[in-house]
A protein has these predicted regions:
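Conserved glycine-rich, hydrophobic/aromatic-active-site segments
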Residues: 16
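Carbohydrate-interacting/catalytic domains
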Residues: 9-13, 23-28, 32-149
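Active-site clefts of carbohydrate-active enzymes
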Residues: 1-7
Length: 149
């Protein structure tokens, strides 16, 4: 399970967000979307309580909804931006531009935004809220942001 492998639900979710929008198909492994920690035997029936972690299930559902809604997130041109504590990349398709930021550390960090993203009003599409971008953005431990410009 990603939760066991990465040490926490938040670390597993950060890893999922960091990789799902990179390029290609979204991979969700058996019961990952409910935070099921025990191994699943693929050759035998395993009962899974789908109400086990409804908040995680809803978070995966929202993220996959965004993945399906915006072609740029699935198939857009990928532009990476190096940062030591944050996985940061842009996905764009000529219609929409998105910045995906994932704090990969178990501590709060700040990251300087790329020039084209500074001093603009954008939208945090996961939270569905306007976001005023300055020179840098602060991310809590293992927090992610999906920003539409």
């Amino acid at each position: 399970s990603p939760i066991v492998e990465l040490g926490s639900e938040r670390a597993a979710m950060a890893a999922f967000v960091g990789t799902v929008f990179l390029h290609g198909g979204a991979l969700i492994y058996s019961s990952q979307e409910i935070g099921h920690e025990a191994p699943i035997n693929f050759f035998a029936y395993t009962s899974v309580d789908w109400s086990e972690c409804s908040d995680i299930y809803q978070e995966y559902g929202c993220l996959m909804g965004l993945y399906n809604k915006y072609p740029a997130l699935r198939k857009g041109i990928l532009t990476g931006y190096p940062a030591s504590d944050v996985l940061m990349y842009q996905k764009s398709d000529g219609k929409d531009a998105f910045m995906i930021l994932v704090n990969v550390r178990n501590r709060d960090v700040s990251v300087i935004l790329p020039e084209g993203w500074k001093h603009h009003v954008a939208t945090d599409i996961y939270e569905n809220k306007p976001l005023e971008l300055m020179n840098e953005i602060k991310l809590n431990a293992l927090e992610y942001r999906i920003i539409r410009f």
